[in-house]
Design a protein with these regions (language model features):
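Glycine-centered loop/turn motif at secondary-structure junctions
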Residues: 123, 184, 246, 275-276
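ABC transporter nucleotide-binding domain
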Residues: 172-262, 282
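Alpha-helical elements of the RecA-like P-loop NTPase motor core of helicases
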Residues: 77, 94, 240, 270, ...
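Non-catalytic surface loops within mature trypsin-like serine protease
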Residues: 35, 126, 234-236, 264, ...
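C-terminal coupling/interaction segments
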Residues: 2-4, 263-319
Length: 319
């Protein structure tokens, strides 16, 4: 049975594996990104993010499993101009202007975006006549964004797009990115900045040891890692048994203070009160940083349906 055009995902990984020598950089990844979604890819260094992006761009064919973009091989989608990429290690081209560079790249695609439009979306229309090798780091990063837009892609892939940018430059970049995403295109970006993922992405995919360990919204990740943190002073008394209190998923004792990650802070606090152990009581909502650390510190935790926090949303938007 032939799939309808709108049912075909922008990105599809099915049991994808990629090894480098004895290292399984990507280990059985299953991932579907619907058309029109914006998805953040998070993970520690070495988690497999860059290799996953390389497979998506056709740079690393899978050793096992399948990777498809819009229902076809990544290389075909890239050649057709359906994918724009902003790699982490791209270097500025010397002795050419911004307009010349973006225009040259656009000329290589069958149906490019008008150069003026790409420059406008990237927020660098005023820099069209400037030489690329004389721009600041933040300006060069926006030039890379314009280059990625040059083919008028349906999917934009960004590997650490705001790395090494200052706060102001990051804000300007994301304003430009929002303009692109509002046009209904699909965006996949990796980042070390959790607040960016939470603010901009529809979904956050967390990788660890080459596997997907969580996939959901920022709020769903917080709940999966334990919705709240309850802390009490335990100096002078035994912390034994705190990990067994109602709702508690984990307990860490450091410097005379116990920190409990709990799914039910009310039940945990009531149990502490019954024990007379509420000195220095503090209850806080788990942050995305807390969730990330919890999800990526579970040694050997396998990826699978049990770790998918919500079903991927396919917005069924045409490219």
């Amino acid at each position: 049975m032939t799939q309808r055009h709108e049912d075909i995902a922008a990105v599809s990984f099915t049991g994808a594996v990629r090894t480098f020598g004895s290292v399984r950089a990507v280990d059985g990844v299953d991932l579907r990104i619907g058309r029109g979604e914006t998805v953040a890819l998070l993970g520690r260094n070495g988690a497999g993010k860059s290799t996953t992006i390389g497979m998506l761009l056709g740079l690393y064919p899978p050793d096992a499993g399948r990777v498809e973009l819009f229902g076809t091989a990544p290389e075909r989608a890239v050649r057709a101009g359906r994918v724009g990429a902003m790699p982490q290690d791209a270097r500025p081209v010397p002795r050419v202007t911004v307009g010349e560079l973006v225009g040259f790249v656009a000329s290589r695609y069958p149906a490019p975006m008008p150069v003026a439009r790409a420059l406008e979306l990237a927020g660098i229309a005023a820099l069209a006549g400037r030489r690329v090798d004389r721009l600041s780091g933040g300006q060069v990063q926006r030039v890379r964004f314009a280059v990625a837009l040059a083919g008028d892609p349906s999917l934009l892939v960004l590997d650490e797009p705001t790395a090494a940018l200052d706060v102001e430059a990051r804000q300007v970049f994301w304003e430009s990115m929002r303009g692109y995403a509002r046009r209904g295109h699909t965006v996949l970006f990796s980042t070390h900045y959790l607040e960016e993922a939470d603010a901009f992405a529809d979904r956050i995919v967390v990788m660890d040891r080459g596997r997907i360990v969580a996939d959901g919204t920022g709020e769903e990740l917080r709940r999966a890692a334990g919705g709240s943190l309850v802390a009490v002073d335990v100096a002078g008394r035994s912390p034994d048994g705190l990990a067994l209190l109602p709702g508690v998923r984990s307990c860490e004792v450091r410097g005379g203070r116990a920190r409990m990650r709990t799914d039910d802070s009310d039940a945990t606090v009531i149990a502490l009160a019954e024990l007379g152990a509420i000195r220095g009581l503090e209850v806080t909502r788990a942050s995305l940083d807390d969730a990330f650390l919890a999800l990526t510190s579970s040694a050997g935790r396998p990826a699978g349906p049990g770790n998918r926090l919500s079903a991927p949303r396919d917005t069924a938007k045409a490219p």
